[in-house]
Amino acid sequence: MPTFKIKPKTGLLIRDPETFELLSESGEDKPKISYWLNHLKNGDVELVTETTTKAKNSNKEQA
């Protein structure tokens, strides 16, 4: 099953429907199923890309 890495939008708490655990703020690989795709469509979660991760890390190094 295809997966994608997603994280909750700032200030939102999103639970995994299978584990009931909160989605990690740093992002997690999740299957591309309707539950996660609907959250993405509604703007509750966002895709995590390598450039997003690298940009945040470089900002932390500058601080």
Curated annotation (Swiss-Prot):
Annotated organism of origin = Haemophilus influenzae (strain ATCC 51907 / DSM 11121 / KW20 / Rd)
Q: Which family does it belong to?
A: To phage Mu protein gp38.
Q: Which InterPro entries match?
A: DUF2635
Q: Which Pfam families match?
A: DUF2635
The organism's superkingdom is given as Bacteria
Protein name, entry field: Mu-like prophage FluMu protein gp38
